[in-house]
Amino acid sequence: MYNKRKASYEMGRENFMSSQQLVNLRIDFAFKQLFGTSGNEDILIAFLNAMLQDSLESPIVSLQFADPHLHREHEEDKLSILDISATLDTGTKVNVEIQLNNNHDMIKCSLYYWGRLYTAQLQKGMPYSSLHKTITINLLNFVMFPEYEAFHTTGVLWNRQQHKILSSDIEVHIVEISKLMQQWRNEQVNPWEDLFVRWLLLLPANEDEQLTQTLEDIAMNQDPILQKAMNKWERM
């Protein structure tokens, strides 16, 4: 069935925009415009629900975009601007970063962003129990872990002795988009059935017309939020 669906792109549609004209969503300004602007909350919710289904106790119902600036407490502090910062209906904080090139310090950078978002929640007089889970998501356009095939890596605070999570408040996700693209070309993943794969494949779809048309088939047949995202993407 998947091969038949995948082959359906050959039929085409006269009005379909060529992938050559589509903006690269792995460029931060385009990514933020689609996933991080007011009015597109439902698009980010769909993406996060697909990605974090094993991390959250229940699906995200609503979220609010937060100020992406990590404000300096002291003049000498580093000024940082996040790609996307949001607060979920449960209070969980989420940061999503898109990275085109390997700067060789992604883990430390992600932990720094996590720490700033986590500590910023606590104001004077507030108990530590008021701190909410904080998740950082790094979408990488390069291979970071060549030693294994999996394109999605999740880091947590781990109790080595008891072999269980020490705290669920910290969670760092690494997604290697180039690995996923190779798996799609090898027909190892199925965007018709896997929501997470579907949304991730949207990011590099500008360079592959077959993939773009496959995603549009899926959007038109079974995913109205993806269809909204693709319509907005085509108008960029």
What are these regions (language model features)?
Residues 1-236:
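Elongated, amphipathic alpha-helical interaction scaffolds
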